[in-house]
Amino acid sequence: MTRSSKASPGVFVALLRGVNVGGNNMISMSSLKQSFEGVGFTDVTTYINSGNIIFTTKENDARKLELKVEQMLSKEYGLGSKVVVRSLAEMEKLVKSLPPHWDSDSNWRYNVMFLRHTIDSEKVLADLPFNSDVEQVVYRPGTLLWSAQLSDINRTNMQKLSSKKIFQDMTVRNLNTTKKLCELMKKAAKT
C-alpha cells in the first residue's frame, strides 16, 4: 500500500550493488550522501564504504524509491546497477526472523541476500547454483539467508552465483552489517 504525500516520513535503507568492490565503481560515501540529499531525501547517513545509505522520506513505496535512486546513480555516477530498498519495518522483521543459531559460531559465515521485488519468491532457490553439501540457504520474504562453515567456503557456489543473470537482482550483506543497519535505522527513527 502506498501512502499519500501527506504521510509521515519513514526510514529506509538503500543497498547499492557493486559499489567500491574490487576497485570498481568507486564512489565516496560523502558524495553519495550529498546526492541522496540532492534528490530530496533527508537525515541521510552512510554505513561503511560499500553502499549502505539510510535516509528518511515521505514516499513509502520501495519500488518508486529504488527507481529514484537508480536514476540518480545513473545520472550522477554513470552506474547502471540495480538498488534494493528496505523500510525499517522490513529490516526489523528480517532481524527478528533470523535463525536463533545464527551468529553463535565464529567458524561459520552468515550472509543475507536481499532480493529485489522482481525475484522475491521462494521459487528463486531453484534457479540458484547452491551446493547443498556445504551451503545452507533459507528463504525469508525479501531475502535468502545463506550460511557455510569457513572451512568449506572454497567449496561453496557463491562465486558461480555472481555470474548468474539473476544475481543482478540481489545484493549481499553479511550478518553483522545487516544487524548494524537495522540498529542505525531504529536510531534514525527516534531522532
Where are these regions (language model features)?
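Surface-exposed, charge/polar-rich loops and edge strands
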Residues: 3-50, 54-191
